[in-house]
Amino acid sequence: MKRWLPIFLLILVLTDRVVVRAQTDAEVQARKDALDVAGAFSNDGFKIRDGHSCGLVKPHEHALVAVNLYAGNQYWFSAATAEPSKIAVSVYDETGKQVTTESYNNGEKAAAGFSPANSGQYLVSVDLVEGNGGSFCLVYSYK
């Protein structure tokens, strides 16, 4: 019993220090809109990957998300923002070179699709084209 007491106290202290940030209403709305866009690709056999990335997109800044992709798969990256603005989604390889993608842009919603020739880490960029910025959400689909 004496051995478990320090372990329990350590867990208690560590969990007390963990700060969990609750999602804002804007992030929830952006995720809903991003899932709506991704749902259109599921009609073509794409599976929506579990998880999502939310954050803030600001003028003249890129919101980057690192993803590991596999050669031979097809991917669609869908993003949305709750605030009235125009966004774009771009994909870059591990050297920072932009890859050629199919694009969908509709104001607050955007998507980029491609099939990587090589497996590895890629960067997905959500860019603010017009507007003052705000919360965004990114989800991706594969097949």
Where are these regions (language model features)?
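Non-catalytic extracellular/lumenal accessory regions of secreted precursors
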Residues: 23-63
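Bacterial N-terminal signal peptides
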Residues: 6-16
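Exposed aromatic-hydrophobic patches
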Residues: 65-66, 109-116
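Edge beta-strands of jelly-roll/beta-sandwich modules across compartments, strongly enriched
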Residues: 130-143
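Noncatalytic modules at the cell exterior or secretory-pathway interfaces
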Residues: 75, 114-132
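Sec/Tat signal peptide C-region and signal peptidase I cleavage site
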Residues: 16-22
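Short, surface-exposed beta-strand/strand-loop-strand elements in extracellular ectodomains
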Residues: 83-98
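Extended extracellular/luminal ectodomain segments enriched in beta-structured repeat modules
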Residues: 68-76
